[in-house]
């Protein structure tokens, strides 16, 4: 599938690699911090970081997700401030990453550092049918923890 990409930072593709799939089985493309200088993110602090690119999906059957990189989250407590970024198919602006330091120490984010990943996913838009009652199921309305440990 092809999507349109605008490079908004001239360092992408020159100083820093363009996003690409690391392996044939990779689901995500790494997004980089397009910063002019390193920033220090204090514990509990959230900052908005530019990626230097805009992606226009165009196809209403797809959306983009911005997800945290597992190593940054596990090793440094660096995750997304909004947990998951949802990019609609008709959005054409720059991809931004809300970076949250949930760790205990200050984290230094360097220019060009990989900070999140972008995944393209299929979308199904639901058509709601209003009903008075649902068809009965074994689970019913059982919610959080309903099935217990198994």
Swiss-Prot record:
Residue ranges of the TM segments: none
Needed cofactors: Mg(2+)
Pfam families xref list: dUTPase (PF00692)
Gene Ontology biological-process entries: dUMP biosynthetic process; dUTP catabolic process
Domain of life from the UniProt record: Bacteria
UniProt entry keywords in alphabetical sequence: Hydrolase, Magnesium, Metal-binding, Nucleotide metabolism
InterPro entries for this protein: dUTPase, dUTPase-like, dUTPase-like_sf, dUTPase_trimeric
EC number: 3.6.1.23
Residues reported in the UniProt entry to bind substrate: 69-71, 82, 86-88, 96
The reaction(s) this protein catalyses: dUTP + H2O = dUMP + diphosphate + H(+)
GO MF, one example: dUTP diphosphatase activity
Family stated for the protein in its record: Belongs to the dUTPase family.
PANTHER family associated with the record: DEOXYURIDINE 5'-TRIPHOSPHATE NUCLEOTIDOHYDROLASE
Function recorded in the entry: This enzyme is involved in nucleotide metabolism: it produces dUMP, the immediate precursor of thymidine nucleotides and it decreases the intracellular concentration of dUTP so that uracil cannot be incorporated into DNA.
Official protein name in the record: Deoxyuridine 5'-triphosphate nucleotidohydrolase
Gene: dut
